Amino acid sequence: NFFMQSFVNRKVNVEAHVENRQLSDLVLNGGYRIARKQINKINAIAARFRYFVPFGDIFEEAEETKKLVSLHAQFGEGWLLPAEIVAFAREGVNNVVSLQPFGCIANHIVAKGIEKRVRNFYPDINFLSLDFDSGVSEVNIVNRMLLFMDNLKK
C-alpha cells in the first residue's frame, strides 16, 4: 500500500491546491487501474491460502482513515499507518504492535498522535508502538511487550 498511497496523496493535494496537475487525470487514473488490476490478480491467487487477507482498496481505506487523521499527513508513512490499524480493527484484529525502525520521527509522531483517537473509535483495540533505534534499551522493549501481553483482550 505504500506505493498505492501516492494515488490518494496526489488526489488530496490537487483538491487542496497544494499540487498542480502535472499529469492528466486520465494518465493517473489509468495507472491506478493497471496497479489495481495486478493487486486483484494477487488477491485471486493468494485467496487459496487459508490465512490470506486480501488487499483492500486504498481509496476506501483513506475514507475510513479521515475520521482519525487528515490525509494531508503525508510525511513518513503518514496516514497509511492509521489506515492499516483501522483495517485491522475492522477485520476484528484488536491487538496491534507497530514496530518503527531507526527512529523514524514522522512515523513516531503519527503513531503516538493517533493512539487516543484510535481507541475512541475502536475501544477494544490494544495498541503498542515500539521504536527501534540505538537509544532504546532491551529492558524497555521487553517491559513494554510484557505490559502489552498482560492487556491482551480475548
Identify the residue ranges that each predicted region occupies:
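An N-terminal assembly and electron-transfer interface module characteristic of large anaerobic redox
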Residues: 1-154
